[in-house]
Structure formats: structure tokens, C-alpha cells
């Protein structure tokens, strides 16, 4: 059944129907309420479900309220109540020695980063004092996390010197076996190096550990902190190791920079 026109009340057929302002109109009946100018869907303005042209569109006016004695009294009373509440809150928080800060996601991320750095520094100091006498410590989750963070830093330091070992190993049939610093000093003092022939299977044993994986960046990322790295979409991230939920540690192959990066920005490629 065909609807009726909102202005003239007659039946509106599909060939001349205009559906606007939740009503149906004839094309000839869809005009400004004031000047009767014909309107269309591109130049009309609706006010209280009636069409208007741009010139006669009702302007909303604001009424200025005078500062009467009653309004001034209410304003002064509100200010006094605000001062009383502020003083009461100040007295309650006095002596606590801290300010209440909103716990935003950015502050949470910075807090986690500072905790990781503190744990790594603590473990480094512990390693320096090892052997001078120690107290047995129970393996709790915090100690496990410290050990994991230290392993990440140690692996990163190992990757930093590994290219030099590869360059030395390019001599056919000869490699320089990795030795501990103490063993190297002892050999050097005795006046001879430590070399031997090797086979292809021995060379394979010196490849990087299986957990040092390569990833590719899916998005651009700008570093938000000193211990993070920036990368672009398509960059390859090598020697990637997980740190905790949501964060990894790796080297951007294009720039050579090493640091922390978000895990949801990269994908595994090998």
C-alpha cells in the first residue's frame, strides 16, 4: 500500500516519492516551511522533522542568566563546599607520603621493564660476589624469572661475538675451538694455541641454538623506551628470544640494533 504525503495528505506513488525525516513526501511538496523553495536530499536541513532551506533554518538561541543575589549565593555556597571537601581529602592523605597516580597501561609496561632491569642487575651483582660465601636460596618463581632474564642477556652477548668466530672458521678444515677465559689465559701463558682438524659434523655442532629464531615484522613500530628497538613492516628480526608474555628480545637485521620488541608485531618465518 502506498503511503500518504506528509504535507498534502495525498497518496505518494513510487515515481515521485521522497523518503526523508521519517516521512514520505511528493517531490513538489518537499519544500522549505518558510519560503517554499523546492528542496532535495542535498540541500535541505531538518528541524523538528520539517524541511528548511539554509537561509531559514531555525537558529538555536541561548538565554543569558543574570547574576541574581540567589545565584550568587548558590555559587558561593558551592565554592565553600568544594574547599571543605578539598581540605578533608588533604587531611586524610597527609602523612601517607605518596600521591595517587592512575595505573595506566603505559605505567604498567614501564613498571615491568624496570623490574626486569632490576632483576638482571641484581643477578649480575650476585654473580660477581659468588664464591665469597653464600646462603642457600629456595628456587621460587622470582628466582626463575631472574635466571631467564640473565640467560637472554648472556645469549645476546654471545651473539655479539659469534660473527668473529665464523670468520675465523672459514679456513678449510681448521677451526679454533671455543675455550673459557681462564683456559685461554693459561694456554696463552704457555705459549701455544689450541687448534685441531675437524669434520663437517663438527662444524654443524657450532651452529646457533635452535631457540634463536628469525621473525618478520608485520607492522611498523617506534621504540617507546631506551631498551626497545624500532623496525618497519617487512624487516627481519634475528636471534629472537621470548622474555615474558607479550615481549621478545632480538636484533633488527636491517639496522643491527638489539633490544626488546612487542611479540604481536612480528611473525615466525623459520
Curated annotation (Swiss-Prot):
Pfam families noted in UniProt: LIM, Nebulin, SH3_9
SMART domains named in the record: LIM (SM00132), NEBU (SM00227), SH3 (SM00326)
Swiss-Prot/TrEMBL keywords: Actin-binding, Cytoplasm, LIM domain, Metal-binding, Methylation, Phosphoprotein, Repeat, SH3 domain, Zinc
Domain LIM zinc-binding residue range list: 3-63
Modified residue annotations for Phosphoserine: 230
Entry-annotated residues carrying Phosphothreonine: 135
InterPro entries: LIM-SH3_domain_protein (IPR051759), Nebulette_SH3 (IPR035631), Nebulin_repeat (IPR000900), SH3-like_dom_sf (IPR036028), SH3_domain (IPR001452), Znf_LIM (IPR001781)
Protein name from the UniProt record: LIM zinc-binding domain-containing Nebulette
Taxonomic source organism: Mus musculus (Mouse)
Gene: Nebl
Amino acid at each position: 500500500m502506498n503511503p500518504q504525503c506528509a504535507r498534502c495528505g495525498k497518496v505518494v506513488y513510487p515515481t515521485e516519492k521522497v523518503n526523508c525525516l521519517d516521512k514520505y513526501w511528493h517531490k513538489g511538496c518537499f519544500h522549505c516551511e518558510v519560503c517554499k523553495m523546492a528542496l532535495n536530499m542535498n540541500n535541505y536541513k531538518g528541524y523538528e522533522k520539517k524541511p528548511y532551506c539554509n537561509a531559514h533554518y531555525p537558529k538555536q538561541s541561548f538565554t543569558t542568566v543574570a547574576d541574581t543575589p540567589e545565584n550568587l549565593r548558590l555559587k558561593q555556597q558551592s565554592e565553600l563546599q568544594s574547599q571543605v571537601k578539598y581540605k578533608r581529602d588533604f587531611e586524610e592523605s597527609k602523612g601517607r607520603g605518596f600521591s595517587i597516580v592512575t595505573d595506566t597501561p603505559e605505567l604498567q609496561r614501564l613498571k615491568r621493564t624496570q623490574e626486569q632491569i632490576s632483576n638482571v642487575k641484581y643477578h649480575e651483582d650476585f654473580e660477581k660476589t659468588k664464591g665469597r660465601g653464600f646462603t642457600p636460596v629456595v628456587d621460587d618463581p622470582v628466582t626463575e624469572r631472574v635466571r631467564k632474564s640473565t640467560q637472554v642477556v648472556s645469549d645476546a652477548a654471545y651473539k655479539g661475538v659469534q660473527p668473529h668466530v665464523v670468520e675465523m672458521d672459514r679456513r678449510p678444515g681448521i677451526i679454533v675451538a671455543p675455550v673459557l677465559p681462564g683456559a685461554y689465559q693459561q694456554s696463552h701463558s704457555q705459549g701455544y694455541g689450541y687448534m685441531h682438524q675437524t669434520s663437517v659434523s663438527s662444524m654443524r655442532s657450532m651452529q646457533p641454538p635452535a631457540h634463536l629464531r628469525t621473525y618478520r615484522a608485520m607492522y611498523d613500530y617506534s621504540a617507546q623506551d631506551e631498551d626497545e628497538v624500532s623496525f618497519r613492516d617487512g624487516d627481519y628480526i634475528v636471534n629472537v628470544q621470548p622474555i615474558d608474555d607479550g615481549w621478545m628480545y632480538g636484533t633488527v637485521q636491517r639496522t643491527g640494533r638489539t633490544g626488546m620488541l612487542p611479540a604481536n608485531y612480528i611473525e615466525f618465518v623459520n
